[in-house]
């Protein structure tokens, strides 16, 4: 018997320690597997710590086994991320997963996943309609789900958990999902006494502020970030034709022309704001930037271990 946690640990923090302790207490007979992203994340960010460091700290705090989520899944939209992660869970004959959930209503997530599975033709029609209107894929997906179910999934962890359960239901995997209550405040900039969201902690790290109250990890500047690689990104986009940029994975729908149009923005934040639109979310843009920076035409053939950035050195716990 085994249970899986699907994670990025960017960075690993006290909330993750609590999740591991909760899982060990409530599933004492199960080995805990972490399906862990590597050096790049689903939002298109460079991980603050590399895969080896994240693996070591997870093992220190209670995980039994670490399985790497391949780059081709780890740096994709939520539905592809979930597809890859749950596929790995099934391949390793792990019969349970547990994830944080704001609603903590796993039965409702199963209900919605079954509705989706039974109404895929209608769902896909609504999805295509919303995409034609210029919605981003996440918003189009939310629109389609609401049309077939009358419900909205609002919170980010519920959305990702729903994607996990969709994969379980669609593939009839012998996996049972469980949830761990995650408070809404956990995600805000008003952290609990010793727990804060990874988003907030990344902000503190980037501002060179201590996160010792919230995490056992320590970071030394400069830390890894797309902002620090923006000059290199500018150079590549300027020197590469739109035709050749379009050969890179995720560069489609004319986003290469949009990048060229705004490539003279003076910094990463202004570039992101200029390119962001109803169709292109920040995460979609950042994922495309990663693929351009490392010239990735086929993510299934990309060996991220060959990318060794100085900013990963001396980051640890």
UniProtKB/Swiss-Prot annotation:
What does the record list as GO biological process? tRNA modification
Organism in which the protein naturally occurs:
Mesomycoplasma hyopneumoniae (strain 232) (Mycoplasma hyopneumoniae)
Keyword Ribonucleoprotein in the entry? The reply is: no
Provide the protein name: tRNA(Met) cytidine acetate ligase
Q: Which domain of life is it from?
A: Bacteria
SUPFAM superfamilies on file: Nucleotidylyl transferase
Query: What taxonomic ancestry is recorded?
Result: Bacteria, Bacillati, Mycoplasmatota, Mycoplasmoidales, Metamycoplasmataceae
What GO terms fall under cellular component here? cytoplasm
Report which reactions are catalysed by this protein: cytidine(34) in elongator tRNA(Met) + acetate + ATP = N(4)-acetylcytidine(34) in elongator tRNA(Met) + AMP + diphosphate
């Amino acid at each position: 018997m085994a249970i899986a946690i699907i994670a990025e640990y960017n960075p690993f923090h006290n909330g993750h320690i609590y999740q591991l302790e909760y899982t060990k207490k409530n599933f004492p007979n199960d080995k805990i597997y972490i399906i862990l992203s590597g050096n790049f994340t689903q939002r298109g960010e460079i991980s603050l710590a590399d895969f080896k460091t994240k693996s070591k700290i997870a093992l220190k705090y209670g995980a039994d086994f670490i399985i790497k989520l391949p780059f081709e899944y780890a740096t994709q939209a939520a539905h592809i991320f979930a597809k890859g992660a749950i596929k790995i869970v099934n391949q390793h004959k792990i019969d349970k997963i547990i994830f944080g959930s704001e609603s903590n209503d796993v039965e409702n997530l199963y209900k919605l996943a079954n509705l989706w599975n039974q109404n895929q033709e209608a769902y896909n029609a609504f999805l295509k309609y919303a995409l034609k209107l210029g919605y981003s894929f996440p918003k189009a997906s939310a629109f389609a789900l609401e049309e077939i179910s009358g419900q909205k999934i609002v919170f980010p962890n519920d959305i990702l958990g729903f994607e996990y359960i969709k994969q379980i239901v669609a593939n009839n995997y012998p996996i049972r999902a469980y949830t761990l209550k995650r408070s809404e405040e956990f995600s805000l900039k008003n952290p609990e006494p010793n727990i804060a969201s990874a988003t907030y902690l990344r902000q503190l790290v980037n501002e060179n502020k201590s996160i010792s109250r919230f995490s056992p990890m320590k970071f030394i500047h400069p830390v890894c970030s797309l902002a620090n690689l923006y000059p290199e990104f500018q150079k590549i986009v300027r020197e590469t034709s739109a035709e050749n940029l379009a050969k890179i994975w995720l560069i489609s729908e004319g986003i290469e022309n949009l990048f060229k149009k705004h490539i003279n923005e003076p910094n990463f934040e202004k570039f992101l704001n200029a390119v962001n639109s109803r169709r292109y979310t920040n995460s979609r843009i950042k994922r495309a930037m990663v693929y351009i920076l490392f010239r990735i035409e086929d993510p299934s053939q990309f060996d991220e271990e060959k990318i060794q950035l100085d900013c990963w050195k001396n980051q640890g716990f």
